[in-house]
Regions:
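Long, compositionally biased intrinsically disordered terminal regions
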Residues: 222-223, 235-237, 244-309
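A contiguous, surface-oriented mixed alpha/beta subdomain in the mid-to-C-terminal portion of proteins
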Residues: 157-247
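A generic structural motif
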Residues: 65-74, 124-126, 148-152, 225-236
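Short N-terminal or domain-adjacent regulatory/targeting segments
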Residues: 1-33, 173-190, 287-309
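Structural alpha-beta junctions
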Residues: 57-68, 115-121, 140-146, 219-228
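An N-terminal, globular interaction/scaffold subdomain
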Residues: 1-119
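Internal, hydrophobic cores of structured domains that mediate oligomerization or house catalytic pockets
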Residues: 93-187
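Extended, compositionally simple fibrous regions characteristic of intermediate-filament-like scaffolds
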Residues: 88, 168-177, 270-273, 293
Length: 309
């Protein structure tokens, strides 16, 4: 059955999916799509539509072969179903692959033959991620492994701590990506005001993996204790740096516009909008090497967990 440019394959296999990619490119008149990577998305059925839409938007900056993988019930006979095609706003190729039965335990055997040759592989878990992404059979196929502790259906703080403890080069979390703009503003503030910071605080919703990472990053950079305060949100609402000359602060109450305050200078507005997942995903796909600052931050956060010295 064909819907637009998407072809549905029932009880199929990797070879048939790969052949359908070739046919889809031919129908589109684009034998070479100029794709730069493979993006694998491991997603539950109820998150699949939103995750694939986010990847579609990100594909305009990073043309890719996008493989959505839905791991279904692992009981019973193995079955692979897929929707394959191009177009529909995609800058590349896409397949949404549903696995059932025994093959769920060996999803990498379906995905591996579909990876673009001689190109990087990124994998994204939009909801619950494995405790150790680099050791996961699908995660082991990728150079970049993207999780999102804030989107987990389990405890968000625990999920972030678990990702910190199992960090491996190539891992990242969208909780970190969400604070890129905060970190840039704070770094700029410290450049403008070359004074010693003697204390700091980060205010955010009580459960906020991003705030925990930001507080840890600040403590690592400034070598001061950073107080983690609770607010009603949304997200991170304020960062304060204490200096002998006075406070340097960035306050954002509406999730869109912040106020930057510093000693002996008038307050000024700063754009600091909470970004959507497609923009966060696109940012992470720009770099496929190890993020050493993230690595240092998560190791420091992991070391602060109860039971660690």
């Amino acid at each position: 059955m064909t819907t637009g440019r998407m072809v549905e394959l029932i009880d199929t296999n990797s070879s048939e999916i790969a052949a359908e990619f070739v046919r889809a490119r031919t129908r589109a008149g684009s034998p070479a799509m100029g794709m730069v990577m493979t993006l694998v998305i491991v997603v539950p059925e109820d998150h699949a539509e939103a995750a694939m839409d986010a990847a579609r938007q990100a594909s305009h900056e990073h043309p890719a072969r996008v493989l959505g993988v839905i791991l279904g019930d692992g009981r019973g006979a193995a079955q692979v179903n897929a929707q394959v095609g191009t177009g529909h706003g995609w800058a590349g190729e896409t397949a949404l692959i549903r696995l059932k039965g025994e093959v769920v335990k060996h999803a990498e055997s379906v995905v591996l033959p579909l990876l673009l040759p001689d190109s990087p592989v990124a994998i994204w878990w939009p909801a619950d991620a494995p405790d150790d992404p680099a050791a996961d059979p699908l995660g082991a196929l990728a150079q970049r492994r993207i999780t999102d502790a804030a989107a987990t259906t389990r405890g968000k703080t625990k999920a972030m701590e678990t990702q910190c403890a199992s960090y491996a080069p190539g891992n990242t979390d969208l909780a970190w990506t969400r604070i890129t703009l905060w970190r840039a503003l704070l770094a700029s503030a410290l450049e403008q005001h070359r004074v010693k910071v003697i204390g700091a605080s980060v205010a955010a919703e009580r459960i906020s993996p991003s705030a925990d990472l930001l507080a840890t990053w600040l403590g690592d950079r400034l070598r001061v204790d950073v107080e983690r305060k609770n607010s009603s949100g949304p997200g991170i609402t304020e960062v304060v740096l204490e200096t002998k000359a006075g406070q340097i602060s960035i306050e954002r109450r509406d999730g869109k516009l912040a106020t930057f305050s510093s000693p002996e200078a008038p307050d000024r507005p700063v754009a600091l909008k909470r970004r959507d997942v497609p923009e966060l995903l696109a940012e992470e796909l720009r770099r496929l090497d190890e993020d050493e600052i993230y690595a240092s931050t998560v190791r420091r956060l992991a070391a602060r967990r109860p039971g660690n010295s």
